[in-house]
């Protein structure tokens, strides 16, 4: 079915704003809650922002690249948008839920589509204890940080930290160390998608750590739990033959 009600959103970048004006003039603008499809104009960062902001609407999002990276985006073209939307293939992403507790006892809940990362917030290395499903798996990881990522997020920070690229349909999460010092050769682990990962910060006052969920940070954490949330669905649309599975494969041969 060819969608008629399209809601456009765009990043503040001039090139994205220019595209927004052109698209609205050509296809009209529908309020997002009433739209059949949301079209996001920008880069991957703006796509993540759009998915977070429209999470409660359960409306598919089609990205058009007006940014830098565009891994989650389709190519930009002014012509034939309705036809592209009618032929687009849908991918379902389940995000991560982060529960972070600070030294002051505050509890923060965050959603992450790509990854949850812990990073040292001072000059000294972070010391982390890692548990999986309530069982301690590593008493002490000395590192710059660690992260847990989804398959969709495995080509982002995880890949830069030498973590594995995960097939989009894989029911696994990647746990990846960031610049590990001890154990020196430990890079991480592949875990079931149902796993709950807990990080406890050792000597948090001397070695402060921050937690980050898709760019939203919590400082001075003492513990962080991360798990996948199957009840939350993000719906992404891609042009045929250019879905996330193909992109993940392609990234490994660049």
UniProtKB/Swiss-Prot annotation:
Keywords per UniProt: ATP-binding, Cytoplasm, Kinase, NAD, NADP, Nucleotide-binding, Transferase
Binding site for NAD(+): 44-45, 114-115, 144, 152, 155-160, 179
SUPFAM superfamilies cross-referenced by the UniProt entry: NAD kinase/diacylglycerol kinase-like (SSF111331)
Keyword flag ATP-binding: yes
InterPro entries membership: ATP-NAD_kinase_N, ATP-NAD_kinase_PpnK-typ_C, NAD/diacylglycerol_kinase_sf, NADK
Location(s), subcellular: Cytoplasm
Pfam families referenced in this protein's UniProt entry, alphabetically: NAD_kinase (PF01513), NAD_kinase_C (PF20143)
Biological processes, Gene Ontology terms: NAD metabolic process; NADP biosynthetic process
Signal peptide positions on this chain: none
E.C. numbers: 2.7.1.23
Catalytic residues, chain numbering: 44 (proton acceptor)
Nucleotide-binding as UniProt keyword: yes
CC per GO annotation: cytoplasm
Top-level taxon of the source organism: Bacteria
Catalytic function, reaction form: NAD(+) + ATP = ADP + NADP(+) + H(+)
Cofactor dependency: a divalent metal cation
Main localisation: cytoplasm
GO molecular function, one term: metal ion binding
Sequence similarity: Belongs to the NAD kinase family.
Protein task: Involved in the regulation of the intracellular balance of NAD and NADP, and is a key enzyme in the biosynthesis of NADP. Catalyzes specifically the phosphorylation on 2'-hydroxyl of the adenosine moiety of NAD to yield NADP.
PANTHER family the record matches: NAD KINASE (PTHR20275:SF0)
Identification of the protein by name: NAD kinase
């Amino acid at each position: 079915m060819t969608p008629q009600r399209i809601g456009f959103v765009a990043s503040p970048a001039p090139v994205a704003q220019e595209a927004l004006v052109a698209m609205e003039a050509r296809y009209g603008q529908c309020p997002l809650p009433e739209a059949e499809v949301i079209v996001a104009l920008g880069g991957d960062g703006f796509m993540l922002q759009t998915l977070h902001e429209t999470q409660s609407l359960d409306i598919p999002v089609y990205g058009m690249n007006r940014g830098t990276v565009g891994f989650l985006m389709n190519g930009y073209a002014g012509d034939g948008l309705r036809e592209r939307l009618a032929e687009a293939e849908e991918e379902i992403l389940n995000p991560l839920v982060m529960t972070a507790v600070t030294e002051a006892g505050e509890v923060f809940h965050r959603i992450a589509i790509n990854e949850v990362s812990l990073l040292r917030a001072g000059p000294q290395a972070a010391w982390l204890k890692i548990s999986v499903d309530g069982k301690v798996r590593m008493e002490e990881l000395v590192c710059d940080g660690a992260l847990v990522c989804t398959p969709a997020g495995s080509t982002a920070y995880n890949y830069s930290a030498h973590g594995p690229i995960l097939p989009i349909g894989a029911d696994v999460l990647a746990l990846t160390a960031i610049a590990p010092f001890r154990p020196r050769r430990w890079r991480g682990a592949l875990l079931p998608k149902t796993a709950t990962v807990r990080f406890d910060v050792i000597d948090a006052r001397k070695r402060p750590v921050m937690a980050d969920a898709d760019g939203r940070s919590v400082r001075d954490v003492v513990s962080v739990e991360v798990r996948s949330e199957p009840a939350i669905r993000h719906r992404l649309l891609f042009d045929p033959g250019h879905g996330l599975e193909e992109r993940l494969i392609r990234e490994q041969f660049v």
